[in-house]
A protein has these predicted regions:
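Structural motif
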Residues: 1-3
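Thiamine diphosphate
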Residues: 11-19
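C-terminal catalytic domains of large/alpha subunits in multi-subunit enzymes
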Residues: 18-257
Length: 257
């Protein structure tokens, strides 16, 4: 159970991947419950590029705590000390003798014969906010007679630390770039002298379609952030920021020639 809301960024998948990695099990064995503020643990919210970095680290801490408890219970049932066992995601094994007890058997024993649940809950708050980095390069064509501009190609290189899920990261970058292109070339809120909004529907407020954004190419520059889960940083907002200055500079360069 997590407190972060998956609003289309795929955080349920990413956080499940982190949990599976920590517990050495398959991602499909992790069940992520949809957020319900009645029962979900507190979370500051899925905004400010915080979900992977902040909630992800909370997931890692929780799984490490749960893993420790699994080893303690397994050692108890095997009749040895917790420091004398190893957990491989499926079995707790006593290192000296090779005796084993399965994860499922530990769960059954806890459910039927124990007063203490096998559960863990942790929180994470970071005193630092390591920034991601991104380079954006735009190619445009301009009709100098009419002023009509066409975006031909956009190339982005992103440093978001360890890329937890390359497919989800790539589509999030592409979506953010499309938003940035809209901010640079199409979107505007217009008011009259009395303060009435003239762009209060999608008939007046133009957002780019797939035909308007040209070719978008995305690459990742790998790095490792020691304060993040598995070395990951954020990726949400940085991708919207670069299209405006990149396109502006491309227009200036093209106009000068």
């Amino acid at each position: 159970i997590i407190g972060a809301t998956d609003m289309g960024t795929g955080c349920d998948t990413i956080l499940a991947q982190m949990a599976a990695e920590c517990l050495e099990c398959k991602p499909e064995e992790i069940v992520v419950f949809g957020v319900d503020t009645d029962i979900s643990p507190y979370d500051c919210g899925s905004y400010a590029s915080s979900t992977t970095y902040v909630t992800g680290q909370a997931v890692v801490k929780t799984c490490e705590s749960l893993r420790k408890k699994i080893c303690e219970r397994g050692a108890e049932y095997l009749g040895c000390k917790p420091e004398d066992v190893d957990f491989d995601g499926e079995y707790v094994t006593e290192l000296a003798t090779g005796k084993q007890i399965s994860r499922s058997q530990i769960g059954n024993n806890v459910m039927c014969f124990s007063n203490a649940p096998l559960s863990a809950s942790e929180a994470f708050s970071s005193p630092v906010s390591p920034p991601p980095f991104m380079v954006g390069m735009a190619e445009v064509e301009i009709d100098k007679e009419t002023g009509v501009l066409e975006l031909i190609d956009y190339v982005a290189v992103v440093d978001c630390g360890t890329v937890i899920n390359p497919n989800l990261a790539r589509v999030q970058v592409e979506g953010g770039i499309a938003q940035g292109i809209g901010m640079a070339l199409y979107e505007d809120v217009v008011y009259n002298e009395k303060g009435k909004n003239f762009s209060n529907s999608l008939m007046q407020y133009k957002i780019p379609t797939r035909l308007d954004v040209g070719t978008i190419r995305v690459e990742f520059e790998s790095s490792y952030e020691p304060t993040g889960p598995f070395g990951a940083k954020s990726i949400g907002e940085i991708v919207i920021n670069t299209p405006s200055p990149a396109i502006s500079n491309a227009i200036r360069d093209r106009s000068d020639h």
